[in-house]
């Protein structure tokens, strides 16, 4: 997802994201969203705190996992609802992890709380993206000098410190991953895709499996 180059402050671009099961088996779903401003930071410092230069309008059923570091980081990006368990998150996309990358991009990891049946579809993860209206065009101060012809010339102008975003390119990359809804498949695929520490991964995946009634196979229980 890449808005047009003439994207302006306060302008909203529609982008509805959901995942449909077009296969013939039940599936579990996770999504990785990568945001980046080419040449600029994702966040800007406003008078009342940190804000995102691109404001994502999330779907109605989006929450953050109430884990250390996740819920606090999710609030400034507009995800204020939190859940302690997938069992408390019916038909909900749950933000499980946030990673800040060296190139200035940011990765957001979401797991859909339920199992998507054949021909079923998740709720909307997001609906649109708006360029923060605080990014204003124009000049904040000007200096003029007489030009010798009875008029004046503009000799110095200080641009708004946020103007540079208008010349930067925002990109959102969305990678959805689906897996057959079995204990082993979810453990393997989600374990690799979530890119979490082993301890955090165990908490998230085990909670998801328990919330969806997926018990460890008897053969594994015996090990």
List where the protein language model places each region.
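Surface-exposed, hydrophilic segments of mature proteins
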Residues: 1-223
């Amino acid at each position: 997802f890449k808005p047009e180059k003439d994207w302006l402050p306060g302008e909203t671009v529609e982008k509805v994201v959901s995942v449909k099961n077009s296969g013939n088996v039940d599936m579990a779903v996770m999504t990785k969203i990568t945001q980046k401003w080419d040449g600029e930071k994702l966040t800007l410092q406003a008078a009342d705190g940190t804000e995102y230069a691109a404001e994502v309008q999330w779907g109605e059923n989006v929450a953050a996992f109430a884990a250390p570091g996740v819920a606090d980081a999710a609030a400034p990006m507009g995800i204020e609802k939190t859940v302690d368990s997938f069992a408390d998150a019916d038909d909900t996309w749950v933000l499980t992890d946030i990673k800040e990358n060296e190139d200035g991009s940011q990765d957001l990891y979401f797991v859909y709380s339920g199992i998507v049946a054949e021909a079923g579809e998740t709720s909307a993860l997001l609906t649109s993206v708006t360029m923060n209206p605080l990014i204003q065009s124009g000049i904040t101060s000007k200096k003029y000098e007489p030009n010798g012809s009875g008029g004046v010339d503009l000799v110095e102008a200080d641009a708004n410190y946020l103007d540079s975003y208008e010349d930067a390119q925002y990109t959102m990359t969305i990678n959805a991953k689906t897996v057959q809804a079995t204990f082993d498949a979810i453990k393997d695929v989600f374990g690799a895709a979530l890119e979490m520490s082993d301890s955090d991964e165990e908490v998230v995946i085990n909670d998801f499996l328990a919330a969806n009634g997926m018990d460890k196979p008897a053969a594994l229980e015996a090990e």
